[in-house]
């Protein structure tokens, strides 16, 4: 297993291929726990993981907390509605409270971009040992979702190894509300790093032409791209054209709560033009997997029948794979010597 150099995990733009490989390899081993009969590992015993979610979440929060518990970490949950934030306490002071309690990892979700990065910078300047894991910030990034989507696809194409090479040269379609999606941005960094070619599909209001140049410059805040050669990004306005010849398709939730400019007014028309159904997949001779990061608007992004078809739709696999991926991240960030310990008996083999 290669080295791990990330103190905080704030985005995937800073990940190298070795970083992706390290996470996927470890997650694949953790995924075998139910098969081998092991339900809990002592790897993070005595560590404290605090989940600070300033936005509603079911899957991500529960997945992180279950991942931490499977590594024997203590978990402290934060709820804004019952916190001192309602009394005027700042977000930073709230986070410092958990640091003072001895939190080793802060998993943070916030509606504003860069809040996790700002907090990580504050902690570094103060010399604190606590690390920050971005659970989703604004429209910027959702690293663990991008990684679990990557792993789900790698496992689908190569169940035995589930490694990066399984995605080399694959054509992956991402359809829907790209402009508001931190998931889409994380997937663009992850999939392109593995050599996949990504096609973004949707109306101009949701998939602006500017996304065609998403990978053209070095990642924000970096002098160079940590990935030497990436796959490509293209834009299409026709879902039928995209699906013909595609290896997989991911559809994104319409984030109506972020649509302040009435970007979409007719959901029936959207479903007709960009919704996934069995009939559309047959018409386009598409036989690959269908993904969705959730939650799903049935009858909008995809039909209820397709969502429930486990032979095609990998939504439940994504949820299931989120646990070992988040276990891997927590393990790499909080274990005293994660690279060395990952080969010991405390991790599954």
Curated annotation (Swiss-Prot):
Q: Which Gene3D superfamilies match?
A: Aspartate/ornithine carbamoyltransferase
Tell me the route in metabolism or biology where this protein functions.
Pyrimidine metabolism; UMP biosynthesis via de novo pathway; (S)-dihydroorotate from bicarbonate: step 2/3
EC nos: 2.1.3.2
Q: Name the Gene Ontology biological process terms.
A: 'de novo' pyrimidine nucleobase biosynthetic process; 'de novo' UMP biosynthetic process; amino acid metabolic process
The record's catalysed reaction(s) read: carbamoyl phosphate + L-aspartate = N-carbamoyl-L-aspartate + phosphate + H(+)
Residues engaged in binding L-aspartate: 87, 182, 253
Q: Does the keyword Nuclease apply?
A: no
Q: Which GO terms describe its molecular function?
A: amino acid binding; aspartate carbamoyltransferase activity
Q: Which Pfam families match?
A: OTCace, OTCace_N
Q: Keywords, A to Z?
A: Pyrimidine biosynthesis, Transferase
Q: What does this protein do?
A: Catalyzes the condensation of carbamoyl phosphate and aspartate to form carbamoyl aspartate and inorganic phosphate, the committed step in the de novo pyrimidine nucleotide biosynthesis pathway.
What does the subunit comment say? Heterododecamer (2C3:3R2) of six catalytic PyrB chains organized as two trimers (C3), and six regulatory PyrI chains organized as three dimers (R2).
- Listed name of the protein: Aspartate carbamoyltransferase catalytic subunit
Source species, please?
A: Synechococcus sp. (strain CC9311)
Tell me the classification of the organism that encodes this protein. Answer: Bacteria, Bacillati, Cyanobacteriota, Cyanophyceae, Synechococcales
